[in-house]
């Protein structure tokens, strides 16, 4: 039961997302992308116990401007016995104006997989989740569990929070409310950072996810915590950032 709860918690905090500054060696006549590529490394703790690491990698396709975002969790120590395979999630998406549109989502953990394609012209999200068929109606603003992090970052930048979102989670569409909880200053390996705290929660659910976004880093989340009934369960904290 503990290992199942650990896995659910790590997936629930679903990868804080960074949007780093445009690289210094970029062409002067080339406009910066809405979201610049980055690689970030985080610690992962379960009830104050170190269970492994989390790596986030955002790439942009130079040909069409679309993005590929990968989140990988690697267990360490005794937890590696339970989770011998890395947990991997990927989202491919485009950015239209200041909004994210997911195109496909993939996840794998050992023999368990999720594969969802977003057909916006046909108005359906279809695929398979843990061997169950997925067929959901698309609506404007619908996100997957990875692309939502980028959408929230862009909304912070543009002052569009608080806001409700619909998110495809496996074979369901779930409703979440993202709210602002105010400023906070954090000490991190990147230095002391002023952050904005954002909380997300489903109606009637006792679990709350909080993320600390740093405006000076392009609203990169430098910390994420999930709590239940006010008690901390899981946490991710940034260690390094490359861009």
Can you name each region flagged by the protein language model?
Residues 27-32, 144, 150-156:
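N-terminal trafficking/processing presequences and adjacent post-cleavage segments
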Residues 110-151:
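Hydrophobic, well-structured mid-protein blocks that either form specific transmembrane helices
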Residues 19-28:
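Boundary at the C-terminal end of the N-terminal hydrophobic targeting segment
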Residues 29-120, 157-243:
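Acidic, serine/threonine-rich low-complexity disordered tracts
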Residues 3-4, 37, 144, 148, ...:
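Hydrophobic alpha-helical segments and their boundary regions
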Residues 16-17, 225:
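N-terminal processing/targeting junctions
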Residues 1-13:
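Bacterial N-terminal signal peptides that target proteins for export
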């Amino acid at each position: 039961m503990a290992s199942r709860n650990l896995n659910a918690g790590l997936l629930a905090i679903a990868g804080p997302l960074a949007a780093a500054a445009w690289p210094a060696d970029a062409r002067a006549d080339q406009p910066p992308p809405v979201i610049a590529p980055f690689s970030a490394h985080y610690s992962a703790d379960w009830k104050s116990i170190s269970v492994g690491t989390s790596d986030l990698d955002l790439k942009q396709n130079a040909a069409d401007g679309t993005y590929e975002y990968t989140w990988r969790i690697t267990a360490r120590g005794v937890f590696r016995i339970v989770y011998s395979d890395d947990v991997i999630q990927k989202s491919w998406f485009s950015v239209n104006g200041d909004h994210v549109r997911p195109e496909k989502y993939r996840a794998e953990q050992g023999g368990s997989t999720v594969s969802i394609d977003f057909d916006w012209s046909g108005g359906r999200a279809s695929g398979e989740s843990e061997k169950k068929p997925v067929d959901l109606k698309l609506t404007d603003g619908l996100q997957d569990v990875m692309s939502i992090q980028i959408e929230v970052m862009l909304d912070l930048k543009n002052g569009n929070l608080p806001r409700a979102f619909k998110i495809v989670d496996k074979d369901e569409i779930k409703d979440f409310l993202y709210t602002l909880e105010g400023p906070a200053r954090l000490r991190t390996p990147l230095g002391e950072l002023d952050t904005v705290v954002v909380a997300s929660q489903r109606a009637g659910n006792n679990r709350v996810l909080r993320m600390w976004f740093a405006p000076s880093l392009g609203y990169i989340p430098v910390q994420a915590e999930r709590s239940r009934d006010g008690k901390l369960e899981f946490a991710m904290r940034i260690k390094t950032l490359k861009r």
